[in-house]
């Protein structure tokens, strides 16, 4: 499927190294209206057929390499490590991909599936806007109509990405209901898909939603861990000790973790949006205060109010501001294979500024949450520890938001 110049093996989508979690025992499922059962069955059938098809595999490989810009580098950040009294720290540079984040890995694959199915239109939700930008770019490249649903709150704080989506030829639909955030954008996209599924593909941006989406997104994002597993050998003769990634829906994290899941010596850490602190009630830390429930067609941990309805969520990072989390993360949380924690807005902002000033790399606010956890644990780690943080996206999209925040603080 995907052959990177530095990797010793191909990304074979018919081989699932995380097979323990392929058929999820507790979470996942397909909780959808009857109108969507057949379209989802068709999607699963098409994907299972295509991932074994030589032409599809070659096309996907060509686009990943020559359009998306894979492989992405593994960068050791010595200045950052010294500043936090830390161990050997590396960044997996998904921020250097075309469109600025890991999202492009998944949308290219899903758009190719949609074209094989004869569909001419793709729709999606987006929070931070990175998924919307990636899908708009992929749709333009592959000659498809594209509609992006985005909560009004996120449109206001992610204007640069909204402008990029429109420049790329896609339509942006503002969703003005409820919390006007990512959950509401997903609701609107699903409604569109229900009525137009005959010619439309719903391109979910994270490893969640009804089956088979979690499987498909995980497989397309697993190119991240495939590359890391090979690239770290340039620096050491062993696997890393710890992997850290931010977790909104969880696609960058599950792709980053995937090829390391069988090696239980590698510690896997997902970092959620802690907002103003869990005690404040204004956060998106699903594993900290959420409980199992069903939302958007799948079963996982969900932030709920006392009546069992979806609670309002909050994070300075639009990409982490979601009420639930991918079902594979729920399984790994309960099995203990991965640890999940959170970082607050202030901690993420501190990490954002520190990496920018010490390494000349501006991280996305989403990725800054993972960096914040790295800062928090760094002094407690042995100096020969090898830690890798997935830099899932770049922070250009967040600059105006952060500058405005700084101005308000100065005048308060």
Curated annotation (Swiss-Prot):
Keywords: Amino-acid biosynthesis, Aromatic amino acid biosynthesis, Lyase, Pyridoxal phosphate, Tryptophan biosynthesis
Entry superkingdom: Bacteria
Required cofactor(s): pyridoxal 5'-phosphate
Gene3D superfamilies: 3.40.50.1100
Keyword field contains Lyase: yes
SUPFAM superfamilies associated with the record: Tryptophan synthase beta subunit-like PLP-dependent enzymes
GO cellular component: cytoplasm
Reactions catalysed according to its record: (1S,2R)-1-C-(indol-3-yl)glycerol 3-phosphate + L-serine = D-glyceraldehyde 3-phosphate + L-tryptophan + H2O
EC code(s) of this entry: 4.2.1.20
Pathway: Amino-acid biosynthesis; L-tryptophan biosynthesis; L-tryptophan from chorismate: step 5/5
Transmembrane segments: none
Pfam families linked to this entry: PALP
Chain positions with N6-(pyridoxal phosphate)lysine modification: 103
GO MF: tryptophan synthase activity
Entry keyword annotation includes Amino-acid biosynthesis: yes
Enzyme class: lyase
PROSITE patterns: TRP_SYNTHASE_BETA
Family: Belongs to the TrpB family.
Self-association state and partner proteins as the record states: Tetramer of two alpha and two beta chains.
Job of this protein: The beta subunit is responsible for the synthesis of L-tryptophan from indole and L-serine.
Protein name, entry field: Tryptophan synthase beta chain 1
Natural source organism: Chlamydia caviae (strain ATCC VR-813 / DSM 19441 / 03DC25 / GPIC) (Chlamydophila caviae)
Gene that encodes it: trpB1
